[in-house]
Regions:
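Charged, alpha-helix-forming regions
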Residues: 1-146
């Protein structure tokens, strides 16, 4: 039997206070992104199956195993993962400061490679920065790790 322990994640209030009701699968996707970004901030090496690349605009493209977003007891529910990515793609975060106004999808261009069981998607630099913006405070989340 696998030992279960808790892993602490910090979630920016900017993300926490977004005016959306996220589904369980959408939350799972967002929490995994927060977890990955937190590991990078802490200087930890990512799982070898995770691939992140920034383009010249510093938007980040993630390639991750689909299993990362599935429940342990439901490893074949790709339909729900696709639905959650589509939904996050249609959710807009509006950003404005003294220099810039932007209307951005939380996630862009999700693509599943069925042979490799991976999903690739892009997050705009401004959205990715929201995951790391603790200037308005943060919320501590506990993730159960097996």
């Amino acid at each position: 039997m696998a030992k279960i322990k808790n892993k602490e994640l910090l979630q920016s209030y900017v993300l926490t206070t977004a005016k959306y009701d996220f589904s369980v699968y959408e939350k799972r996707i967002l929490y995994r992104i927060v977890e990955i970004q937190q590991e990078l901030l802490e200087g930890k090496k990512l799982n070898e199956r995770y691939f992140l690349a920034a383009n010249h605009h510093q938007d980040v493209t993630y390639t991750l195993p689909i299993s990362l977003f599935l429940k342990e007891d439901d490893r074949n529910n790709h339909k729900e993962v696709k639905k959650a990515f589509r939904s996050l793609q249609t959710k807009i975060i509006e950003y404005q400061d003294e220099d810039t106004w932007a209307s951005l999808s939380i996630i862009a261009n999700p693509k599943i490679k069925t042979r490799t069981e991976t999903i690739t998607f892009t997050i705009d630099k401004m959205i990715n920065d929201v995951f790391l913006d603790f200037s308005k405070g943060y919320r501590t989340c506990k993730k159960r790790v097996r």
